[in-house]
């Protein structure tokens, strides 16, 4: 699969990596982001397993390569580390705020691309260079894709690259859905927040999320 939306290696994309591991970077996230990421990781793993069981994406090369039982534990890691790029932002910019100025919002929205670069750099032990080198390792690609593409949306309205439809990696689609499920369930005040969250997510089939993937929630 082409690295659609991949961070291009250039002088502008070099970053200073002060972390020695993903876990060290994870610990640099503010508590609420760490807690959210743990929940999203659990939902991602469950959705990943359900997607495999339902043959979601059957016949599509990218799905065949990535949607395999051997990657179930990896799916959890993809959910856990999907916001790792926020470790490269100041704490006050790690949590989205409605009051952000345009400049602050633009800074906040750099975290997915920074996350991919952080993941890739530590994979390659190239912390000093802070650049991404190509890889054909599916597990490595899935982690990079989850970081960079989880805020992309099916209709192309997401960020950072405005990808749409099948341009978005399967694992990123799943992490994005898991994150939205967590957000809705956390905001809904009722006895059955997950049931109501799923009802809301079904309305986004073909808009924010893949219709086929939404069916996994049924």
Each language-model region and where it sits:
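Histidine- and acidic-residue-rich, metal-dependent catalytic cores
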Residues: 3-218
